[in-house]
Amino acid sequence: MNKFGLIGDPISKSLSPALFEAGYGGKYSYDLIEGSDFGASFKAFEDRYKGINVTAPFKEDAFRRADFYTSYCKKIGASNLLVKTPDGIMADNSDFTGIIMSLAEAYMPGIVKQFCAKYGESAHIKVHQFVKQALTQLFSRKPQALVVGCGGAGRAAAVAAAELGFDTALMNRTAEKAQKIADEMPEYSFIVDQLTDFQAAVRECDLIIYTLPMKIEDIDLLDVADFEGEDRYQWPRPAKVIFEANYKNPSFSGEVMERLKEGDAQYVSGNKWLLYQALTGYVKFTGEIPDLEAMEQVM
């Protein structure tokens, strides 16, 4: 029987095994391969597993070990999914598709289930195409996105936002890392902002994707007007979307969450990201579409 698993550190509290079991009714095994030595974990994959998911801090290490890549994975330069094939180890990035699906659901509730039922394993492609076109109608001017954090998840978020048609700014604790991404992907015309400009950038942008694992102090400085946005009454547009990767210990919580709601912004939990990257990624392992409703029960 084919075996699957997750590489990362720490991962002892990961929901991935439960999601995988729910998605396939226990048909396949899914193990946690935890440890700080990526080489040792990768050797375990080579010896015993058909496919693995990869989480922090190893997404860029995984990318470098692959023999070939899907198109967006190659562009992003990080992988959260490795699969053995007759042609070698394939790297994919279901963070990218998970982000696309999460944002699609935020702007158009119900679209994921509808498209999954209609298009099966190609649903994420159809969702991407449909939402990219639809967003041009939802906004009366070019929408703007801010991606905070430029690790593996941040790279995927930046490409996803740009692919959906957002003018995208990158922000990182070290601006040089953000600039490196911008230089590597000139086709997206990424802007690099300083972390000191976080509050002003949140107010200006329509979409904020926060991928840092920790909370920056400026989050607590955000007020209702920042979440409403600077052009709230000038241009018709959807509510501001705050999308956070960290579902275990979110940075947007407590009083700032109350101000977010008062400003009519929409918060999207990292649970959605986890769910939809699993949905679009697991099919690459098995060739079978997992049970989305059963996976939702895990969340």
Model-derived segments and spans:
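Short acidic low-complexity segments
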Residues: 39-41, 187-205
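NAD(P)-binding Rossmann-fold cofactor-contacting core
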Residues: 166-185
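Glycine-rich adenosine-cofactor-binding loop
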Residues: 8, 91-96, 103, 107, ...
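Phosphate/diphosphate ligand-binding glycine-rich loop within oxidoreductases
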Residues: 2-115, 122
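Rossmann-fold NAD(P)-binding glycine/threonine-rich loop
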Residues: 241-292, 298
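Rossmann-fold NAD(P) dinucleotide-binding segment
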Residues: 61, 216-243, 255
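Rossmann-like NAD(P)-binding element
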Residues: 174, 198-226, 235
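Short glycine-/small-residue-rich Rossmann-like dinucleotide-binding loops
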Residues: 57, 210-214, 246-247
